[in-house]
Design a protein with these regions (language model features):
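Cytochrome P450
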Residues: 1-378
Length: 378
């Protein structure tokens, strides 16, 4: 288990560290291996296969080939957030998880991928089961297998439909891709769809919920954010450091004997990277347990390269693929909450948490308020 910033960064960039669970020796059991019956997604692959699959998907998600996929979503995001907060009007208390933090990223990733929004109740059940594979103690192998099979059937139908009648979404683009990297097989399309759907919402929900909770615990920061909307960029960056949605990465393996911090990690052993601890390493940041968005003020401290300051999105070749989208969603949701909720306060502190050890965030977050400021459109 590695918990210090410098060593984690070193290992994230070390080619002798694999993300493929097949490299584990038998003694290191209990590591999630992805979805049973499907090939690993690129999250669980090493170069060169990782790089090829990531490049294929990137072509349809980010500049230079697809410059507007994320940026072009900004107006739609504002509309979705505005609509969800409009739903709070006339009430004095809401569950931020169920009524904003979860429905927002679900709506966005469905639209992006071309998954019908009304199918959420179906895939929600499968995803809940699949996430249990992150926690080997639940003993849910049969449930995980069943959920994987049902979700694969569902996505097979969806991919075939998009191939026959392609739209402007990512599943259509991936299913009909004839770019320089060659086509994805049907199995690769399935594992990529699973990865994007799950990574695309199960993490962002925690960033928005952890963010709301943290801001309500620091009312002076919330008040500053209300008066200075530009501050939201720093707030989200500091949240990724201070209350990250992904606490640790449990699926790395040493491909060789690796010397680090006067310790030898033997070949074949499992390496757990404690990203959240690394982001609070006192040798890396000043006063690490203080929530202080100003530490990301570029005018005061000169923000270095993306990802340099915290490990919220990991690092190296597996650096979060969806980081620009996650940032935009959290900035929009938290900015609008700060602007529109009048006198917001926590009803229960601490709130009940999800039981997942990797993905950390509240299961529910009851927030009371006096009124709702009308939306800009209103
Ligand atoms: C606040 C929200 C998010 C957080 C905190 C987060 C965090 C992370 C982290 C820590 C990793 C690295 C895992 C590793 O090193 O093994 C990662 C990888 C990844 N994330 Fe995110 N993520 C978020 C949102 C998203 C979104 C919205 C998407 C999709 C649109 C996404 C897609 C991915 C993918 C595909 C990978 C695998 C990248 C690779 O293996 O090359 N993530 N994410």
């Amino acid at each position: 288990m590695v918990s210090t910033y410098r060593e984690i960064v070193e290992l994230l960039h070390d080619p002798r560290v694999s993300s493929d669970p097949r490299n584990l020796t038998a003694s290191a059991a209990g590591v999630p291996e992805g979805v049973p019956g499907l090939p690993a997604s690129f999250l669980h692959l090493d170069p060169p296969e990782h790089d090829r699959l990531r490049r294929v998907v990137t072509r349809h998600f980010r500049p230079p080939h697809t410059p507007d996929r994320v940026d072009g979503l900004a107006p739609e995001l504002h509309k979705i957030v505005g609509g969800l907060i409009d739903g709070f009007v006339g009430r004095t208390e809401v569950d931020i998880v169920d009524e904003l933090a979860y429905p927002l990223p679900v709506a966005v990733i469905c639209q992006l991928l071309g998954v019908p929004r009304e199918d959420e109740p179906r895939f929600h059940v499968w995803v809940e089961s699949l996430l249990k594979s992150l926690d080997p103690d639940t003993g849910a192998a049969a449930e995980v297998q069943q959920a994987g099979t049902e979700m694969a059937q569902y996505f097979s139908g969806l991919i075939d439909a998009h191939r026959r009648a392609p739209g402007g979404d990512m599943l259509s683009a991936l299913a009909t891709d004839d770019g320089p990297e060659g086509q994805l097989t049907q199995e690769q399309l399935l594992s990529t769809s699973f990865l994007l759907l799950i990574a695309g919402h199960e993490t962002t929900v925690n960033l928005i919920a952890n963010g709301t909770l943290t801001l309500l615990r620091h009312p002076h920061v919330l008040e500053r954010l209300r008066r200075d909307p530009e501050m939201v960029f720093r707030v989200v960056e500091e949240l990724l450091r201070y209350e990250p949605p992904v606490h640790f990465v449990p699926w790395r393996t040493a491909l060789d004997d690796i010397e680090i911090a006067d310790t030898t990690m033997p070949k074949g052993s499992r390496i757990v990277l404690l990203l959240a601890a690394g982001s609070r390493d006192p040798d890396h940041v000043r006063a690490p347990d203080r929530f202080d968005p100003d530490r990301f003020d570029p005018d005061r401290f000169g923000l270095a390269r993306e990802g340099d300051q915290h490990l919220g999105f990991g690092g190296g070749i597996h650096y979060c693929f969806g980081a620009p989208l996650a940032r935009l969603e959290a900035q929009t949701a938290l900015g609008e909450l700060a602007r529109r909720l009048v006198n917001p306060r926590l009803v229960t502190d601490p709130p009940p948490y999800r039981t997942n050890p990797v993905l950390r965030g509240p299961r529910h977050l009851q927030v009371a308020f006096d009124d709702i400021v009308p939306s800009r459109e209103g």
